[in-house]
A protein has these predicted regions:
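A structural motif corresponding to the C-terminal lobe/cap of the Radical SAM core domain
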Residues: 1-176, 189
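Auxiliary Fe-S-binding modules of radical SAM enzymes
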Residues: 114-257
């Protein structure tokens, strides 16, 4: 199947990897993730030349207080450059939503955004402030420049020698636009706040994988957006991380974890 996907032109897949913890997967009903070694499965997909983008969640009732540390190790081991991490949201029509209604823990109808609101629509088992701080720590660590570029390098290391997807930097479609992208990335990112990590990544990637220029540059440009967005979420005064959750005050009784 993977070979056929490559032949058909697939170069990326999104997987709901969720969490490395078995009890949290069982709670979520994600039993398919328990039937295989997820790390090896992801590596197998990557070895065919397909990038894996992963979705990860924290906020399950069975999540331990150190859930952020578990997720950080998991994401780095998977070598998924783009990790979409969100707080658990209870959606109408799901078993989770119905259970939370019965337990009196539902707070509101979700907006559908579980990655930027920094809020939850139900009362979690552990203190909400603690959970949001864990989420903040998780984002902060996986999108540190060094950690992000390490995942990119490891992913490039896992690619086959010859990737079927054409590299426009080395093919007949090479153009001045490609040169402009490369030069803009180099000058903009070299003199950015993470310039050292960027240069280290670019140099090592070009030396090890001179045949994968397009992917190398794409990850660099993508990284600029992800690192900038993460800093904005974490360190801007207007960020929801710096706002209280008034509608929750007085309603939360935390269970011992």
């Amino acid at each position: 199947l993977l070979d056929l996907m490559v032949e058909a032109g697939f170069y990326m897949v999104f997987l709901g990897l969720e969490t490395p913890l078995a009890h949290s997967l069982e709670e979520a009903g994600k039993v398919q993730n328990l039937k295989t070694n997820v790390v090896e499965s992801v590596r197998k997909i990557q070895s065919r030349g397909i990038e894996v983008t992963g979705g990860f969640i924290i906020g399950f009732d069975s999540d331990p207080l150190d859930i952020a540390d578990h997720q950080i190790r998991f994401i780095q081991e998977l070598a998924v450059p783009t990790a979409m991490v969100g707080l658990l949201t209870a959606l109408p029509g799901t078993r989770l939503y119905d259970r939370l209604v019965r337990e009196g823990r539902l707070l509101n109808t979700p907006s559908g955004n579980n990655t930027h609101d920094l809020d939850m629509n139900f009362i979690p088992r552990q203190p909400m402030e603690r959970l949001i701080q864990s989420y903040r720590k998780l984002l902060e660590q996986i999108y540190k420049p060094k950690a992000y570029f390490r995942r990119c390098l490891e992913f490039l290391n896992r690619l086959p020698e010859k990737v079927r997807h054409s590299d426009t930097f080395r093919s007949g479609t090479f153009s001045l636009r490609n040169v402009a992208i490369l030069l803009r990335s180099f000058f903009k990112q070299t003199f950015s706040w993470y310039g050292f990590s960027y240069l280290s990544y670019i140099l090592r990637a070009f030396i090890r994988h001179p045949d994968k220029i397009e992917q190398i540059v794409s990850f660099a440009v993508q990284g600029h957006h992800l690192l900038k967005l993460t800093r904005k979420i974490l360190y801007t005064d207007s960020s929801p991380l710096f706002q209280t959750v008034p509608h929750v005050q007085g309603r939360i009784k935390y269970d011992t974890v």
